[in-house]
Amino acid sequence: MGRKTVLLTLGPRFVEAIAYLAIMGLGLGAYLKSVDGISYVQFIAPGVAASAVMFGAILETSYNAFVRIHVRRVFEAAVTTPLSVGDVVVGEYLWGATRGAIYGVVFLGVMAPFGLVASWWAILCPLVFVIGALTFAVLGMTYTSFAKNIEHFNIFWTGILTPMFLFSGIFFPFTGLPDWAQVIGWC
């Protein structure tokens, strides 16, 4: 993969995570001085890192995989080799997980110099990122396997991922939500 492709592939999602951290952390952080005894930007940083992992893995195994399957017909070409369909799907899982984990690790590296990594336990974050990214890569690929056309991803993104992102407790304490909203968040 060339440098330009890497930048076009990884850059926008990484910039989006940095933008969330800067806009929400510094913007709302100017009004919300602390949450649970820490600064607002410190509060949201781990959640933004986790969301970068989630969205990176999901994007790779939803829209991007759909295009590889139905538009570019990469899967058809791959199974004409000694690879089985299972091999190709596992490769998609692993690439989606790799991409999601890369976002998390790079984002963690950006957080550290700004004092947003509060514990040495953060050294285990890459492992958590890989597990989370693999989980979301499998979820994305599973949905993609049932999608008949690319418009079906609107349901997946706006009906499942966006509520999960917004109700997950990234931007405000999860326990402060009403009971019905906490149920949505736990789902």
Which residues does each PLM region occupy?
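Membrane-spanning helices that line or support transport/gating and their immediate boundary helices
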Residues: 60-64, 68, 138-145, 176, ...
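Transmembrane alpha-helical segments that form the membrane-embedded catalytic/substrate-channel core
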Residues: 53-61, 133-142, 166-170
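Transmembrane helix-boundary elements of multi-pass transport/secretion proteins
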Residues: 3-69, 116-125, 151-155, 176
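Hydrophobic alpha-helical transmembrane segments of multi-pass membrane transport proteins
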Residues: 16-24, 41-113, 159, 165
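Transmembrane helix segments
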Residues: 28, 144-187
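Hydrophobic alpha-helical interface/terminus motif in multipass membrane transporters
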Residues: 27-28, 32, 65, 75-78, ...
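Alpha-helical transmembrane segments and their short interhelical loops
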Residues: 85, 89-158, 162
